[in-house]
Structure formats: structure tokens, C-alpha cells
């Protein structure tokens, strides 16, 4: 190991050795003279930034008090923030059982919440089923601290991942796994497809988890990033795991957990505010709170509390949906113009497009991604999302940018994709 002589633990050395090649490549890349790139690879929403800044500036100016300079005043985080989160979730996620403040633990972002959850759920080397394709960040998130293992679940046709055909694929992956399985992680809305799971599929997944005695983990960070899309007239609406009558379908509520943050739906990933919601598992709630109760910034808590309780919140969500739709149309009009295949989306700031339709190998895909980078646009190649072998050439494109930047990104992409 490259880090063997550095005095690190085996766990630390393993993490460093795994990530160091990527860090070296990134540092080398920064030394190259190049046109500043437009980032379409990171799933961030830039469409509400001015409104969020205006609102939170006022909140910090008027709402920051002397006690905010102390540690959070509640076991699971800032009391006002937790109260605001509970009211917000009850209003917009329509839970079957109302969410109480003592169901919630906060942490710096949903990824930290999930990391803490996995640390408390899994012994090192135990697995979590994750339907593919999935967010490439799960690869490091699972392993870096918790030493858990994402166990990929592939449906024969990737397009069927959000259908009832997922259930037999889950059964197969569970039975064939060489390591103990502790849970199923479902990202809903799905990343990178930007669509929602039907309620019936979610209920079947919860039943599957109940039958195996494992946990159902619902990552809902794009819950309110939905918009109208005529390409998907019959698309299922977003349904939170909280909305399902878990006991009513004969399952154990103590094994159902939900995660959300302000990062995606409110374009504020820099605030680092996330929460876990577990309604019938006091031990897990305490474990989650213990690990993160002093980690969230009071400034972020003040700003996020103001955002979640603002009288303007319904207006902001409506504005977000409108702007997402407009930004989506701008990107898809470009894709249609060049006959680039894409998967229609209606619940995310990104879409999945086949930017390298002639790709026969992963190297072919990588080459087109590199050409786009040279043209000044970063996109996220499909291989990183663990797509099926027959899906070479795809990439995730974030479209939720200001119009001027989106238009410039399209102009640059056209120099590459317009020649294929």
C-alpha cells in the first residue's frame, strides 16, 4: 500500500489508497491551462439561489442570537431547526403517522446522516442492496467510515428498475450475496433517472425487506424537485416512505427510515443541513443523534429554519418547479436537435442522456466525456453509476443552471456532440 509507512490504521490506509489516484489526477488537472469549465456533473440546483440568499441573509441578520454561538440546545440538533423540519415534512411529505421532533436527528447533509446510519446498522463487510444504476457517491460513502458494502441489484433491462420487475432482482441479489445483507437503499426520486418509484413498487420493496428481516432505507433528497413534463403524462407522483401505512401492509415500522436535506430541493448544498427520520426505533434514533448532535452549524440552522418556515415557501417551491421545467426544456431541445437519446425526467435537476451513442466499450464512453471536458463542460459518465453492460455511452447532465450558463454549456457541447 502506498500509505503503509504513514502510520495510518488499516481502515485509514485503505481509504487513502482507494482515493489517492483520483486526487492526484484532479491536482494535475488543475495545473493545466484551460477555459473555466461549466459543471454539469454535480447535481446542484442553481435556479433559486438569489431568492434563497435574500431570505437567509435577512434571517441571519434578524434571527442570529447569542445562544446560537453555543453548541446546539437539543440532543439531536438545534431545537428550532428540528421543530421546523417536523412541520415541513408533515406539510409536504404527507406522512401516514405525523412526524414528531423526537423522530428526527440532524447532521451536516443527508450523506452524513446516511453514513451515520450505516455505521450503526452494519458490521464491517456487511452489505446493503442498492438498485443500479445509482449515485456514484455511494461507493465511497458506504466504505469510508462504515466499511459497509453496496451490493448492486441489476434488473435485466435498466429501464425496468422502477417497476415491479425490481422485486425478483432483489430476491436474486439477496440469495446470491456472499456477505450478510442488512438493508435495501432506495433513492426516490431515482438518481440518475430523475423519476419516481410507484407506490406499489415501494410497498413491495418494504414487504421484501420485512420478509428478510432487513431495513428499508429511503433516500429522498430530491423529494420536492418535481416539475410538469408532457413527455411523462402518466408518471407516478413522488410518494415518501413516510406516506406508506407500513403496519397496514403487515410490516415492521422500526425497520423503515427516511433521509432528506435542504441541499437539492433548495439548491443549498453548502449549508450542510440534513436529517434522518425514524419513527419507531428509539435505539437507532439515539445512535444517529449521538453521532452528530454537535456537528451542524448554528448559522446553517438559523438559515434553514427561516427557509423551512418562510411564508414564501409555497411560492418558492412553485417557482422552482417552473424554472426546472424551463431549464429541462432548454437542455432537451438541444438533445432532440442532435437526435441524442435521453430518459425523460420530472423529479430532479438532471437527466440521463446517451452522449456517446456509438460507444462499444467503456473507453469509448470515457473518450467522449474527455472531449466534452476539453470543450469546457464536465459531465458524469454512466459507468460511474454502475449501469448495465449494454448501456455504454450514457452520462448524467445537470440542467438546473442559470439560463446564460446553460446556453454556454450547450454551445460548448455542440462542438463535440454535433459532430457525431
Curated annotation (Swiss-Prot):
Q: Does the keyword Metal-binding apply?
A: no
Under InterPro entries, the record lists:
Aminotransferase_I/II_large, Ethylene_sulfur-biosynth, PyrdxlP-dep_Trfase, PyrdxlP-dep_Trfase_major, PyrdxlP-dep_Trfase_small
Q: N6-(pyridoxal phosphate)lysine: which positions carry it?
A: 264
Q: Which Pfam families does the entry mention?
A: Aminotran_1_2
Biological process per Gene Ontology, one example term: biosynthetic process
Q: In which pathway does it act?
A: Mycotoxin biosynthesis
Assigned keywords, A-Z: Aminotransferase, Pyridoxal phosphate, Transferase
Q: What is its EC number?
A: 2.6.1.-
MF GO annotations: pyridoxal phosphate binding; transaminase activity
Presence of keyword Transferase:
yes
Q: Which SUPFAM superfamilies match?
A: PLP-dependent transferases
The family database entries (Gene3D superfamilies) matched by this protein are listed as: Aspartate Aminotransferase, domain 1, Type I PLP-dependent aspartate aminotransferase-like (Major domain)
Could you say which cofactors this protein requires? pyridoxal 5'-phosphate
Source species, domain of life? Eukaryota
Q: Which PANTHER family match?
A: AMINOTRANSFERASE GLII-RELATED (PTHR43795:SF32), BIFUNCTIONAL ASPARTATE AMINOTRANSFERASE AND GLUTAMATE/ASPARTATE-PREPHENATE AMINOTRANSFERASE-RELATED (PTHR43795)
Q: Which family does it belong to?
A: Belongs to the class-I pyridoxal-phosphate-dependent aminotransferase family.
Q: What does this protein do?
A: Probable aminotransferase; part of the gene cluster that mediates the biosynthesis of aspirochlorine (or antibiotic A30641), an unusual halogenated spiro compound with distinctive antifungal properties due to selective inhibition of protein biosynthesis, and which is also active against bacteria, viruses, and murine tumor cells. The non-ribosomal peptide synthetase (NRPS) aclP is responsible the formation of the diketopiperazine (DKP) core from the condensation of 2 phenylalanine residues.
**Which protein is depicted?**
Probable aminotransferase aclI
User: Which species expresses this protein natively?
Assistant: Aspergillus oryzae (strain ATCC 42149 / RIB 40) (Yellow koji mold)
Its taxonomic path starts at: Eukaryota, Fungi, Dikarya, Ascomycota, Pezizomycotina
Amino acid at each position: 500500500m502506498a500509505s503503509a509507512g504513514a502510520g495510518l490504521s488499516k481502515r485509514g490506509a485503505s481509504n487513502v489508497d482507494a482515493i489517492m489516484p483520483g486526487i492526484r489526477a484532479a491536482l494535475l488537472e488543475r495545473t493545466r491551462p484551460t477555459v473555466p469549465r461549466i459543471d454539469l456533473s454535480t447535481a446542484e440546483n442553481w435556479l433559486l439561489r438569489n431568492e434563497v440568499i435574500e431570505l437567509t441573509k435577512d434571517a441571519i441578520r434578524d434571527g442570529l442570537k447569542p445562544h446560537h454561538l453555543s453548541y446546539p440546545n437539543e440532543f439531536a440538533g438545534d431545537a428550532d431547526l428540528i421543530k421546523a423540519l417536523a412541520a415541513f415534512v408533515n406539510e409536504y411529505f404527507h406522512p401516514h403517522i405525523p412526524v414528531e421532533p423526537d423522530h428526527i436527528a440532524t447532521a451536516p447533509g443527508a450523506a452524513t446522516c446516511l453514513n451515520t446510519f450505516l455505521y450503526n446498522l452494519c458490521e464491517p463487510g456487511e452489505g446493503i442492496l442498492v438498485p443500479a444504476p445509482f449515485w456514484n457517491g455511494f461507493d465511497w460513502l458506504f466504505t469510508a467510515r462504515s466499511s459497509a458494502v453496496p451490493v448492486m441489484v441489476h434488473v435485466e433491462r435498466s429501464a425496468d428498475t422502477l417497476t415491479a420487475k425490481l422485486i425478483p432482482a432483489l430476491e436474486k441479489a439477496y440469495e446470491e450475496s456472499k456477505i450478510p445483507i442488512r438493508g435495501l437503499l432506495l433513492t426516490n426520486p431515482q438518481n440518475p433517472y430523475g423519476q419516481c418509484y410507484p407506490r406499489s413498487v415501494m410497498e413491495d420493496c418494504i414487504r421484501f425487506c420485512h420478509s428478510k428481516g432487513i431495513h428499508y432505507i429511503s433516500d429522498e433528497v430530491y423529494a420536492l424537485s418535481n416539475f410538469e413534463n408532457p413527455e411523462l403524462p402518466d408518471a407516478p407522483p413522488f410518494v415518501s416512505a413516510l406516506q406508506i401505512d407500513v403496519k397496514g401492509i403487515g410490516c415492521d415500522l422500526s425497520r423503515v427510515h427516511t433521509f432528506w436535506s435542504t441541499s437539492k430541493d433548495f439548491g443549498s448544498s453548502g449549508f450542510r443541513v440534513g436529517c434522518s427520520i425514524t419513527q419507531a426505533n428509539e435505539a437507532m434514533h439515539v445512535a444517529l443523534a449521538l453521532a452528530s448532535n454537535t456537528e451542524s452549524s448554528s448559522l446553517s440552522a438559523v438559515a434553514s429554519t427561516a427557509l423551512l418556515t418562510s411564508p414564501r415557501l409555497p411560492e418558492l417551491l412553485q417557482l422552482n418547479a417552473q424554472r426546472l421545467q424551463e431549464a429541462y426544456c432548454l437542455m432537451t431541445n438541444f438533445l432532440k436537435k442532435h437526435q441524442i437519446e435521453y430518459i425523460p425526467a420530472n423529479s430532479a435537476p438532471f437527466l440521463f442522456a446517451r452522449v456517446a451513442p456509438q460507444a462499444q466499450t467503456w473507453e469509448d464512453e470515457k473518450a467522449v466525456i474527455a472531449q466534452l471536458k476539453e470543450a469546457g463542460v464536465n459531465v458524469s459518465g454512466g459507468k460511474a453509476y454502475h449501469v448495465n453492460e449494454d448501456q455504454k455511452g450514457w452520462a448524467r447532465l445537470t440542467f438546473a443552471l442559470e439560463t446564460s450558463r446553460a446556453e454556454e454549456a450547450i454551445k460548448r457541447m455542440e462542438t463535440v456532440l454535433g459532430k457525431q
